[in-house]
Regions:
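HhH-family (HhH-GPD) DNA N-glycosylase catalytic core used in base-excision repair
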Residues: 1-170
């Protein structure tokens, strides 16, 4: 879930190639080198060395300014807040989130700067902690309007329509 949290914080107002580039930069700066098997480098787009995903302590050590220098933009303060909360125990990214209700889990995650309902729902869905989480972005809104207009008109809860695996149904 730490990797999901960082990745979804970076996803805000961003595109996939840029998100990948930022993660590669953060990993190169803060991650540990990963040993490659002989012949693996030829499958890595010219990368000779791979690095692990940066842990919370490494990102916190960079500080907001250091994170900003890694081209994270306005998200630097969000990453720093998430890292500091995670390290201090103020952000649980474990089974604790699965053991509480969806709305409470969303509320817990939304205490972090930069995490709103959609990002929290993405973290909960893709971590496997809450398959009932139903992240709605502009594309999902358009899809629902096109394919399930009555759902939107009624203001129905997606779980009432799609069941306990509403997020998977997306």
């Amino acid at each position: 879930p730490w990797e999901l949290t960082v990745s979804f914080l970076l996803s805000q107002n961003n595109n996939i190639p840029r998100i990948k580039k930022i993660i590669r930069t953060l990993s190169g700066e803060c991650g540990a080198p990963i040993s490659l098997q002989p012949g693996a480098a030829e499958h890595l787009n010219g990368d000779e060395v791979l690095f692990s995903f940066p842990d919370a302590a490494s990102l916190a050590a960079l500080g907001e300014d250091g994170l900003y220098a890694m081209k994270t933009g306005f998200r630097a303060k969000y990453l720093y807040d998430a890292a500091c909360r995670y390290l201090s125990g103020g952000l649980a990214l474990d089974e604790t989130l699965a053991d509480i209700g969806l709305e409470q889990a969303i509320g817990e995650l939304c205490r972090v700067r930069g995490i709103g309902r959609k990002v929290a729902s993405c973290i909960l869905l893709f971590s496997g902690f809450h398959p009932d989480a139903f992240p709605v972005d502009v594309w999902m809104q358009r899809s629902l309007a096109r394919d399930f207009p009555a759902l939107l008109e009624r203001g129905a809860d997606p779980c009432d329509v799609f069941g306990p695996y509403a997020g998977i149904a997306q």
